[in-house]
């Protein structure tokens, strides 16, 4: 899940963590397999998935780009950057589906905290609810009241949310003091 956010680094004093993120988005498909997990990004279909993968020792990376691809570095910069402070990669798009294990529902505060770990580094976060039918009150409250209050300058937007999720998010945003 952290790969999909960007700004992933083990040495923040010397490295921004944007390199692998920008490279991934230049390719049409990317697949990384390691320690029994496989993460796949498909820019054409606009989705990412995590599945069980090979348990072979080591890490494998497969990257494909079509000769007719329209991915450019400028397009990647434009999509994941705001005009605030002329920063590059200060906007994250996070597929909510990556926070789930198997087909579990997203109900708890701990699931929301896992999804939003390290997102305070950005100016803008777009949460993609594609494929998510239901979230719990606590999950929504942790993101749209607790996290938002801790980071008031961070803009959080939602896409691909169904009516249930839109109503729940709206309720938390408008009546946050009534939720706990």
Stretch-by-stretch model annotation:
Residues 1-53:
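Flexible ATP-lid and adjacent glycine-rich G1/G2 motifs of the Bergerat
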Residues 99-177:
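Amphipathic alpha-helical interaction surfaces in cytosolic regulatory modules
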Residues 36, 66-70:
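Two-component histidine kinase transmitter core
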